[in-house]
Amino acid sequence: MPQLDTSMWLLTILSMLLTLFVLFQLKISKHSYSPNPKLAHTKTQKQQAPWNTTWTKIYLPLL
């Protein structure tokens, strides 16, 4: 059975990581962020669940 040649694996993995790093840096650098972001206040409406408005009876299981 022939041996698997692993001499190039380190170079392949390192070049892949370097390429991914460069690609992500280019992708992130294209985003434009506003220098002064302002929070938008949104009103949250509390939704009423049916069991909050009516009384429900919970039974214990028979032992």
Swiss-Prot record:
Residues that bear N6-acetyllysine: 57
First and last residue of the signal peptide: none
Source taxon at top rank: Eukaryota
Subcellular location: Mitochondrion membrane
UniProt KW Metal-binding keyword: no
Membrane topology per record: Single-pass membrane protein
Family: Belongs to the ATPase protein 8 family.
Record's subunit section: Component of the ATP synthase complex composed at least of ATP5F1A/subunit alpha, ATP5F1B/subunit beta, ATP5MC1/subunit c (homooctomer), MT-ATP6/subunit a, MT-ATP8/subunit 8, ATP5ME/subunit e, ATP5MF/subunit f, ATP5MG/subunit g, ATP5MK/subunit k, ATP5MJ/subunit j, ATP5F1C/subunit gamma, ATP5F1D/subunit delta, ATP5F1E/subunit epsilon, ATP5PF/subunit F6, ATP5PB/subunit b, ATP5PD/subunit d, ATP5PO/subunit OSCP.
Protein name: ATP synthase F(0) complex subunit 8
Source organism (scientific name): Balaenoptera physalus (Fin whale)
Gene: MT-ATP8
